[in-house]
Design a protein with these regions (language model features):
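A generic N-terminal leader/anchor concept
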Residues: 1-3
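Assembly/oligomerization interface modules of large self-assembling protein complexes
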Residues: 6-9, 16-122
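Sequence/fold signature of self-assembling virion shell proteins
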Residues: 38-43, 202-276
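A broadly conserved detector of short glycine/acidic/proline-rich loop/turn motifs that flank catalytic sites
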Residues: 85, 196-198, 259-261
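Long, contiguous amphipathic alpha-helices that act as assembly "spine/axial" helices in icosahedral shell
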Residues: 100-174, 251-261
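Extended amphipathic alpha-helical segments with heptad-repeat/coiled-coil character used for oligomerization
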Residues: 179-219
Length: 276
């Protein structure tokens, strides 16, 4: 049975507290408030909490007339994630030329074709659950729990996609001098500490820090990254395809889901690594 989860329109039963912990759901039909799925992803994603944008993208098509016959074709409108930096003025002495400044705008294209399908640089990610009828019947809110697991998985995958792109860019070692030279304010900096724990320590106030920057732990990389995460984003295609199959005559079931994600990092110069 094929289906689609609309990340922009569908709602998720609120089985979680603000920290993402599942609440105990009583048997029966509990009256719960609903939570938009895009908000749930933002709440779970570590890179989003560090400042990155999570873009739930629905391909926008534009009607374009052709020739004089009135025929219309649908054309996909290219979208971008853009960052821009301050373009300071410089003192120019009499008789001197103005120095050419670096172009202050950088952008990365979102790679979706006219049919909303994936193109180059957009990764396709899948997951699959298998369970029997006994499992299905033994949980009072089985479908809701599966939905929450998928949404949390999208958040984790978004983290892994963006952090993988940052690590692949081989950032320079972090120093406060480098951050100052890049025009990054202290309040913009956030750190994510990977499984190697490089540079991580807990200060006297119980706050995890890496190279002095407030940090959080992530299982999705080994390195430690410090940077201005507001200059990065992850695109998640708004439609997540879900297929439910019966895998045996005993009624065993499988749920398969497919999602398209793309890291968007126009400028990697505002990210650094922390050594061990």
């Amino acid at each position: 049975v094929p289906g689609i989860i609309d990340l922009l329109g569908d709602e998720l039963p609120n089985l979680q507290d603000k920290n993402g912990a599942l609440k105990r759901t009583p048997a029966g039909n509990p009256a719960v408030e609903n939570l938009k799925i895009d908000a749930a992803i933002l709440r779970q994603s570590l890179v989003a909490q560090a400042g990155a944008e999570i873009i739930i993208y629905k391909d926008e098509a534009e009607a374009v007339s052709t020739g004089t016959t009135g025929d219309v074709v649908m054309m996909s409108k290219q979208s971008y994630f853009e960052t821009f930096e301050a373009a300071p003025f410089a003192l120019v002495a009499d008789g001197s030329e103005v120095t050419v400044s670096p172009f202050p705008i950088k952008r990365t294209a979102l790679h979706l074709d006219a049919a909303g399908g994936p193109q180059t640089n957009t990764g396709i990610y899948g997951l699959r659950f298998e369970f029997n009828r006994t499992t299905l019947k033994s949980y009072p809110s089985f479908e809701d729990a599966i939905m929450h697991a998928i949404v949390q998985g999208l958040a984790r995958t978004a983290d892994a996609v963006l952090l993988g792109a940052l690590v692949a860019a081989t950032p320079a070692p972090f120093t406060l001098a480098a951050a100052a030279a890049a025009g990054v304010r202290m309040g913009e900096l956030a750190a994510l500490v990977g499984t190697a724990g490089h540079g991580a320590a807990i200060d006297n106030n119980g706050v995890l820090r890496a190279a002095g920057i407030a940090a959080e732990l992530t299982p999705d990389m080994a390195a430690t990254i410090v940077g201005s995460f507001a200059r990065s984003a992850v695109m998640i295609r708004s439609d997540v395809d879900v297929i439910v199959d019966r895998t045996s005559v005993q009624g065993d079931l499988a749920v398969t889901a497919w999602a398209a994600l793309q890291p968007l990092v126009p400028d990697t110069s505002r990210f650094w690594t922390v050594a061990a």
